[in-house]
């Protein structure tokens, strides 16, 4: 007669076959049908337990120390519960700061710690210090990109244009010569440099002058005026040379104007000038043998207007009054490249009357900023933080170091006038330095 133990085994075997037949349609499957489900459940629970334990350990290790802020040196303290920024100079008394920028300037910015509100509850409090209006967040230096830097003039309505500035703009390779009309004055923009010319001058030919803004003009390097030759000896017989003083002459193949070299007859001989210098005099150049010019040169070998190319210049035939015109600076050139028709976003605040003293919009890379300095400034001299469409002056290397920008940041050098047109983030006379930050607010 079967024993109870054998009956139980037989019952279990029969039950397993019934379940296998129902689930797997195979009563002879030796593997229990729910085994994989059980193993999967067990492994999932085990992995979840490991993850929970790992996060718990991470939270324990990264939990702000209750007394990490109490050091015998200046420390910036960030309250992780409230977001309030404090600083301490002696590890005992803590002072609220108007912003992280001010706290870094006061302490030197070397040490920044986090603490909970409870950890700071027993600390002695001082008055609030800092620069009201200074940035409440500083861009990471890895996001600080100045070039390519682009200033664009955009059509708004008839005879109304906006001027915008973008850092970290797309690069350009082409360069276009244009005419620019601002405040009833006409300029040639050649090689990225603006030259004043007489109104009604033939230099532009049939090109349409862009009726631009003063802000766009001031963003360009200013070259010397291109004007007709004027001298008390004009028309007199020259001491050297066969032409009257002031005569424009050329050498080269008479059938190939591209080969012509231009000169002006001075009292003591011939002096080289550019194509545009020749054209502004509104004369028909006289052909002279190159050998004769070479043997009768003036002591003033070259009187061309500085910054102008010596050869012919073709101005764009595009109607610049109806499209964007941009000047793009790069790190390796003091003069920008001029492009026409770029797709550029306009200002978010579309005012009926665009700003004159500032750009209508200033944009940096998303989440980033830029550091700029004026042309001619020493390496350790004043720089400007461009952040959230405004500029903040940083007067010296010490202040820049406190803000974390002493090294690892490419500082863009730009024209002083360009820099002056970026809206100020602080009142006149206030800069990001320890002197201004270390005052009760």
What are these regions (language model features)?
Residues 1-441:
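Short, surface-exposed polybasic-aromatic patches that bind anionic ligands, especially phosphate groups
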